[in-house]
Design a protein with these regions (language model features):
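Helical element adjacent to the flavin cofactor pocket in flavoenzyme catalytic cores
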Residues: 148-160, 179-244
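C-terminal catalytic lobe of FAD-dependent flavoproteins
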Residues: 164, 292, 332-415
């Protein structure tokens, strides 16, 4: 049995630890914060095979150019002189070509479906303590232009074997008996599911603790020691830790951590915001993405979460209240009588999504070291891809045949 250190206690790191433990490894998790403060905790809670189009696509570039200089738009890049951002931006632009997007759809589709199945297995094994519901997800639209685009996407989904159902405005309203819905129509993806991400993380965390997995929380990585082609030790502000293998899954901090090993990663942190309203009297029945405004709406039992935006402004940037107000305004535009009020600032959550330039994650070994696995860059799909990523990481560490071809996720594809 080998000892494996997992750096990162978000949903990606926790799922890696879960599968490594199941694979018979001794596992130690090191996390810079605690389990409930990371990006995974406040996200929309989707596990979405419907999201088979990579972030880097011709559509997002066209829209992004319109949006990027408005601080209240769904996509915003804070103008600044930053060499890493410039490198990332140029690569993102190149990888957004249609030819690259079409090449990346099959592996993204495969890992999404693998993860969807594995998420159900985790629920079946640990119990549904994280409020997982399998009612699908709506893509709702208000304009004819967006309707045309979403119906074209539905046809692409069908070609991949993904079921879709197209609804007019009346059909959407019938699916939401408690609230008025102001839309032109929507596309439902029945395969999608949703859950409470914080509850999922707590469920896995408590399970691993009960099995003897060690957690070192509020512990910052300061460096590593190497012996030949192996990482031998991780140095932290709480002491040093040795292991046979190391998995780095530190989210938007991944390139900061890998620099200690001389590894440069193209990755930017994209900030997203969410608000969670408790005990909503007349709540949504269906999760939905408000496509024209890029806002996600997720009922979580009697609670309701709304979130969105992609703000590339650096890890030290403050909250932009305009962006949160834009999310709330969009929600009220689609659901005029939704019984919620704009929250106070302390109830607004934000976190950072780690963005690779092509929208695909980094999963695999780095050629500089025989015992190092990187896992990051999942963008808005961290929860959707967490279970599959954890499974693949365990297979890589164990020297097993992976459940799918991971060539597209090569951690050195931009070298």
């Amino acid at each position: 049995m080998s000892k494996v250190i997992v750096a990162g206690g978000g949903v990606i790191g926790l799922c890696a630890a879960y599968y490594l433990h199941k694979g018979g490894h001794e596992v130690v998790v090191i996390e810079r914060g605690d389990i409930q403060t990371g990006t995974s905790f406040g996200n929309a809670g989707y596990v979405s095979p419907s999201h088979f189009i990579p972030l880097a696509s011709p559509g997002i570039v066209a829209k992004g150019l319109q949006w990027m200089l408005s601080s209240s738009s769904p996509f915003y890049i804070k103008p600044r002189l930053d060499l890493d951002l410039i490198k990332w931006g140029l690569t993102f632009w190149r990888r957004s070509a249609k030819s690259h997007m079409e090449k990346n759809i099959p592996p993204l589709n495969e890992i999404l479906h693998l993860s969807r199945a594995l998420t159900s297995e985790i629920r079946d094994e640990l119990g549904n303590h994280f409020r997982m519901e399998e009612v699908g997800c709506f893509m709702l639209y208000k304009s004819a232009v967006t309707e045309k685009h979403e119906i074209e996407l539905a046809k692409e989904a069908a070609a991949l074997g993904i079921e879709t159902k197209i609804f007019d405005a009346k059909g959407v309203q019938e699916m939401e008996p408690e609230v008025e819905v102001n839309v032109r129509g929507g596309v439902l993806y029945p395969i999608d599911c949703h859950l409470h991400p914080g509850d999922l993380m707590q469920t896995i965390y408590q399970y691993l603790q009960s099995k003897g997995v060690q957690f070192h929380l509020n512990t910052t990585i300061e460096g590593f020691e190497k012996e030949g082609r192996k990482v031998s030790k991780v140095i932290t502000d709480k002491g040093d830790f040795t292991a046979d293998a190391f998995v780095l899954a530190t989210g938007s901090w991944l390139p900061i951590v890998t620099k200690h090993l001389g590894i440069e990663l193209l990755l930017q942190a994209g900030k997203g915001y969410s608000m969670t309203f408790e005990n909503v009297e007349k709540n949504l029945h269906q999760p939905a993405i408000l496509v024209d405004d890029r806002v996600a709406m997720t009922p979580m039992g009697t609670d309701l979460r709304m979130g969105g935006t992609m703000e590339i402004s650096g890890l030290q940037s403050p909250m932009l209240i305009k962006r949160v107000q834009a999310i709330f305004k969009a929600a009220k535009n689609y659901y005029p009588n939704l019984p919620v009020s704009f929250p106070s600032s302390e109830k607004i959550w934000w976190g950072w999504r780690p963005l690779s330039p092509d929208g695909l994650p980094y999963i695999g070994r780095h050629s500089a070291f025989d015992n190092l696995v990187l896992s990051g860059g999942h963008a808005m799909l961290g929860l959707s891809l967490a279970a599959a990523t954890g499974k693949l990481v365990e297979e890589i560490v164990g020297g097993k045949k992976t459940s799918m071809d991971i060539t597209a996720f090569n951690v050195e594809r931009y070298n």
